[in-house]
UniProtKB/Swiss-Prot annotation:
One of its GO terms (cellular component) is cytoplasm. PANTHER family: IMIDAZOLEGLYCEROL-PHOSPHATE DEHYDRATASE (PTHR23133:SF2), IMIDAZOLEGLYCEROL-PHOSPHATE DEHYDRATASE HIS7 (PTHR23133). Its EC number is 4.2.1.19. Pathway: Amino-acid biosynthesis; L-histidine biosynthesis; L-histidine from 5-phospho-alpha-D-ribose 1-diphosphate: step 6/9. The gene is hisB. It holds the Pfam family IGPD. This is Imidazoleglycerol-phosphate dehydratase. Its main location: cytoplasm. GO terms for molecular function: imidazoleglycerol-phosphate dehydratase activity. It comes from Cupriavidus pinatubonensis (strain JMP 134 / LMG 1197). It catalyses: D-erythro-1-(imidazol-4-yl)glycerol 3-phosphate = 3-(imidazol-4-yl)-2-oxopropyl phosphate + H2O.
């Protein structure tokens, strides 16, 4: 089974992430940031990952450290669960619409962290959630999962829809990339022989 549990404790946050890459989309989310929980739910449901997140942080200051550190810890959990990457598809992509909004996410388990994030949010907040924290979440994920990630919101008016389509597309692209390819069961998907 491709499962992992990772704990991250700093002076700013205490986070535990439990992940099953071959799950059914079950989730138990308590990040302390309600909108982040809503977005993590999208990743779990659309990625078909079993995901538990428990976090406490210095949200009395703002949500930045918690959101970023959940991204970091999730990235570490994915890297741990995926192991040596033998047999994975490696690449994943998804387009997801929601009413007027359309987003595209493309991922590569290259071992080279890189993020291209192009989301022209139409407002600064969704409820109390600062949409600038979205890029911090994904930057933390990318740097600790060791992936190249391209995120593009192609159109949208509603900032909630922009966020939601990004997270849904991310879950679906991640699912595709970590899917095991039975034709390549014991091989690394790279001409270098390593990722």
């Amino acid at each position: 089974m491709r499962v992992a549990e990772v704990t991250r404790n700093t002076s700013e946050t205490q986070i535990r992430v439990s992940l099953n890459l071959d799950g059914t989309g079950r989730q138990k989310l308590a990040s302390g940031v309600p909108f982040l929980d809503h977005m993590l739910d999208q990743i779990a449901r659309h990625g078909m990952f079993d995901l538990e997140v428990e976090a406490t942080g210095d949200t009395h200051i703002d949500d930045h450290h918690t959101v970023e550190d959940v991204g970091i810890t999730l990235g570490q959990a994915v890297a741990k669960a995926i192991g040596d990457k033998k047999g994975i598809t490696r690449y994943g992509h998804s387009y997801v619409p929601l009413d007027e909004c359309l987003s595209r996410v493309v991922i590569d388990f290259s071992g080279r962290p890189g993020l291209e994030f192009h989301v022209p949010f139409t407002r600064a907040r969704v409820g109390s959630f600062d949409v600038d924290l979205t890029i911090e979440f994904f930057r933390g994920f990318v740097n600790h999962a060791g992936v190249t990630l391209h995120i593009d919101n192609l159109r949208g008016i509603n900032a909630h829809h922009q966020c939601e389509t990004v997270f849904k597309a991310f879950g679906r692209a991640l699912r595709m990339a970590v899917e095991l390819d039975p034709r390549a069961a014991n091989t690394i998907p790279s001409t270098k022989g390593t990722l």
